[in-house]
Regions:
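A conserved short coil-to-beta-strand element within the FAD-binding core of flavoproteins
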Residues: 1-23
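Short, surface-exposed charged micro-motifs
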Residues: 3, 15, 33, 91-94, ...
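Glycine-centered tight beta-turn/hairpin loop motif at sheet-sheet or coil-to-beta transitions
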Residues: 27-30
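Short hydrophobic core segments
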Residues: 32-44, 194
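Central beta-strand plus flanking loop segment that forms part of the substrate or channel wall
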Residues: 43, 47, 51-80, 108, ...
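Short Gly/Pro-enriched turn/cap motifs at secondary-structure boundaries
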Residues: 57-59, 81-85, 93, 155-158
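Conserved FAD-binding catalytic core of PHBH/FMO-like flavoproteins
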Residues: 66-106
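C-terminal catalytic lobe of FAD-dependent flavoproteins
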Residues: 89, 98-99, 110-193
């Protein structure tokens, strides 16, 4: 998707043909034609959506940082421990992995860069400090690796509007289907979304 966005593809709707409306996507000089376009572009779904839809959406990348602890920490808990959720997400969890390690995180930080999956000292400190609220025996020296990922946070002008899971056909554009703003629980909901 990044290459599509950086190439600024031209999206056009052809007049209805015998088989119905067709969409044309141009990428690197190649043209792809299809009656259905599924926009599942993650943090770039707003840019794809806004190329064709009059009603604009905005997605902000929300970075989540994790620590993976050594296996000698794996017996500190035997089930997933969640903290009190906030408006930013479900909070820092502590959970055992299938390999016997302990996973702690994620943070939730809205950032401007849609490709920034770097971990930060501040974020990893926050993971350890908040994770220690649930499991006080966490020791940062037992961290074997850390990583970050991005969730696609759908921003609305009206705070009362639902802020995730924009799934469906775009108004006025039959066959253009958005699957955008899938935050949490994205993995759990994937089978139902399709």
């Amino acid at each position: 998707v990044t290459a599509i966005v950086e190439q600024r593809p031209v999206w056009t709707e052809n007049p209805p043909a015998k088989e119905g409306r067709m969409y044309q996507v141009q990428v690197d000089g190649e043209i792809f034609v299809a009656p259905i376009v599924i926009n599942a572009a993650g943090v770039y779904a707003d840019e794809i959506h806004n190329m064709i839809c009059e009603e604009k959406i905005r997605i902000v990348p929300r970075r989540g940082e994790y620590r993976l602890m050594d296996k000698n920490c794996g017996d500190l808990v035997n089930s997933t421990i969640f903290q009190q959720p906030s408006k930013m997400g479900k909070g820092i969890l502590v959970t055992p992995t299938v390999h016997g390690n302990l996973l702690v995180g994620p943070t939730a930080e809205d950032i401007p860069d849609k490709q920034d999956v770097d971990t930060t000292a501040e974020g990893l400190t926050k993971v350890l400090n908040l994770g220690s609220n649930s499991v006080d025996a966490l020791d940062g020296r037992q961290t074997i690796t850390s990583f970050a990922g991005l969730r696609a946070h759908l921003v609305h002008e009206e705070p009362a509007e639902k802020s995730d899971f924009l799934i469906g056909e775009a108004e006025g554009h039959p066959g253009f289907i958005d699957v955008a703003g899938i935050e949490s629980p994205g993995l759990t909901s994937a089978p139902a979304i399709g």
